[in-house]
Regions:
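Mature catalytic core of soluble alpha/beta enzymes
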Residues: 1-220
């Protein structure tokens, strides 16, 4: 699901512009399109060309010109991502006989960095439970997935990092059972140039890092 891993499905889709998709990729694309609609375009997984322009995927940071931003921003449009699912087979063939086919708009590229960890956490929780695991805590960076409770029946404790502090500085601790805790903020990935700080959370309407008062957001 990584846009940077040359062996991933997403990488192949970005290179080719279309792809016969697995169920995982299909589910992510459909969910991404739902969130795109729900947020009126503030979440848009076709933002990848703009992310690359700023250098966030590679670490080769660069403050682009306004013209460069506008050129890449013209490619960002979640409505142009099309997917033909098994259910849309006009001939009514059995689902096993028809694969899903994904097509991007011209020169578009996608990045599931905003939802892939949460999706992976959910799938891991489902897999563990299928194998009888009733107590576990899955950590995927800023995404924590709790399965059940601790073996002693008590709640899991998940620390929320202080965005103004270090790695071990916390602003609070949450008690969770069979829940996911997701935290994101610009304090983890950013660069500075000419006295300005540029975070990795890009506004798909402007092509520039999001500018606001929120340092960190946690969703349970």
């Amino acid at each position: 699901l990584s846009a940077e891993n040359s062996k991933s499905e997403v990488y192949a889709l970005n290179e080719q512009g279309n792809l016969q998709a697995t169920d995982d990729l299909e589910e992510l694309i459909l969910r991404g399109k739902e969130i795109y609609q729900e947020t009126d375009g503030l979440f848009d997984d076709t933002i990848y060309p703009v992310m690359k322009l700023w250098g966030f995927p590679t670490g080769n940071y660069h403050v682009p010109t306004a013209a460069e931003v506008q050129k890449k921003l013209a490619l960002v449009d979640g409505n142009k991502v099309e997917i033909q699912t098994r259910d849309s087979d006009e001939k009514g063939r059995d689902s096993k006989e028809k694969a899903n086919f994904v097509t991007l708009g011209a020169d578009q590229q996608i990045d599931f960095g905003g939802i892939a960890k949460g999706y992976t956490g959910q799938k891991l929780a489902e897999l563990f439970q299928e194998y009888g695991v009733s107590s576990a805590l899955v950590s995927l960076g800023g995404n924590i997935q709790a399965i059940g409770t601790k073996p002693d029946g008590s709640s899991w404790k998940v620390g929320i990092r202080d965005p103004k502090g270090g790695q071990q500085d916390y602003i609070g601790v949450l008690s969770v059972e069979s829940q996911a805790v997701v935290t994101s903020g610009g304090y983890e990935r950013y660069f500075e140039e000419d006295g300005e700080t540029y975070i990795h959370i890009i506004n798909p309407r402007t092509g520039y890092p999001a500018d606001g008062d929120l340092l960190s957001v946690t969703i349970v």
